[in-house]
């Protein structure tokens, strides 16, 4: 006789699953009275053990003991750095923020660009409305380029 296996006949292997512990049901159960929570303290209370991050038991927490130092400038997040040697890949002439974005030298999230000196520059550029470091400005001007605000 061949028995077919059906979904309603499936059950876990013997000893693979155990019943949920029913706590607070008398001393004979092993989990009566305090229900495995011990005596008193925060862990014995409902919602116990849930403490705020950084809480040190009433002691002044670390984030209040240490001094507040520095900050992150928002303008840095909106400014993209363009290395000066990458400008040599562009055609010589006028360069503005839109042309840098078209050349994919500036990400779409940036609101302004700044030229940083790195490498050499051989072509002549006229930069419109683009910031630069002192070294990059000197390098662009020595090649015959200029800046327009």
UniProtKB/Swiss-Prot annotation:
It holds the Pfam family Ribosomal_L27A. Residues 36-49 have a biased composition (Basic residues). Binds to the 23S rRNA. It comes from the Bacteria. Part of the 50S ribosomal subunit. The gene is rplO. GO terms for molecular function: rRNA binding; structural constituent of ribosome. GO terms for cellular component: cytosolic large ribosomal subunit. Belongs to the universal ribosomal protein uL15 family. This is Large ribosomal subunit protein uL15. HAMAP family: Ribosomal_uL15 (MF_01341). InterPro entries: Ribosomal_uL15, Ribosomal_uL15/eL18, Ribosomal_uL15/eL18_sf, Ribosomal_uL15_bac-type. The keyword rRNA-binding applies. Gene3D superfamilies: 3.100.10.10. The keyword rRNA-binding applies.
């Amino acid at each position: 006789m061949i028995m077919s296996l059906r979904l309603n006949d499936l059950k876990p292997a013997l000893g693979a699953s155990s019943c949920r512990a029913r706590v607070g049901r008398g001393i004979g159960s092993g989990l009566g009275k305090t229900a495995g929570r011990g005596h008193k303290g925060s862990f014995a209370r409902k919602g116990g053990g849930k403490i705020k991050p950084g809480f040190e038991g009433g002691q002044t927490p670390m984030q209040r003991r240490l001094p507040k130092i520095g900050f992150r400038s928002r303008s840095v997040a909106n400014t993209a750095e363009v290395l000066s040697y990458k400008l040599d890949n562009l055609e010589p002439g006028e360069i503005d923020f839109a042309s840098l974005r078209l050349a994919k030298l500036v990400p779409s999230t940036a609101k302004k660009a700044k030229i940083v000196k790195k490498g050499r520059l051989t072509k002549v550029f006229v930069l419109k409305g683009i910031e630069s470091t002192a070294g990059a400005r000197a390098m662009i001007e020595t090649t015959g380029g200029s800046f327009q605000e």
